[in-house]
Design a protein with these regions (language model features):
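Short, solvent-exposed recognition segments
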Residues: 1-102
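Juxtadomain coupling helices with adjacent low-complexity linkers
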Residues: 77-107, 120-163
Length: 163
């Protein structure tokens, strides 16, 4: 489920490859996971940005990274991130619909930057929300980030200059 903000704007071939990697990480095809990830990608593309929620998988990853911090190794890092991706597939991670009045425990808001391409070349990401935020706050944050992302795209395409 990682990198959905990039995948949502990619060609169908890349979307299918992303879905296949998710199934491979789980060891077998999972219809429910497939539908969940497809809905997430459709929502991200329609809305123009990705919202991820705080999860137990994220908390476990943070703990694992703290444990290996002083005795860092590639094998331990690979194990921690693989477990994170595996666990994430079991949780409600991508916010599909935003209710302006509801409160959400947001992990990240990601807005794609297209620059001169049809697919994102990078994303602006806001994270480290330590309190719940409302759907309307998410929309406001994303709107401001999108304005900046659109400006970077115009600058990269030569449609605007730095003043």
């Amino acid at each position: 489920p990682i990198a959905a903000c990039f995948t949502a704007f990619s060609a169908s071939k890349e979307l299918e490859a992303w879905l296949s990697r998710a199934h491979e990480a789980r060891g077998a095809y999972d219809e429910k996971l497939d539908q969940k990830l497809r809905v997430a990608a459709i929502g991200i593309r329609a809305r123009g940005y990705e919202v991820t929620l705080r999860t137990q998988a994220e908390a476990k990853l943070t703990e694992a990274l703290h444990r290996i911090h002083s005795a860092w190794s590639l094998a331990a890092l690979d194990e921690a991130t693989s477990q994170f991706q595996y666990d994430l597939c079991d949780e409600y991670y991508h916010l599909d619909r935003i209710d302006p009045k509801a409160n959400y425990e947001v992990s990240t808001v990601s807005v794609p930057i297209f620059a001169y391409r049809e697919v994102p070349v990078l994303c602006f990401v806001a994270g480290s929300f330590d309190k719940t935020i409302t759907g309307s706050q998410i929309e406001e944050i994303a709107s401001r980030m999108k304005e900046s992302a659109d400006r970077v795209t115009r600058l990269a395409a030569g449609q605007e200059t730095v003043a």
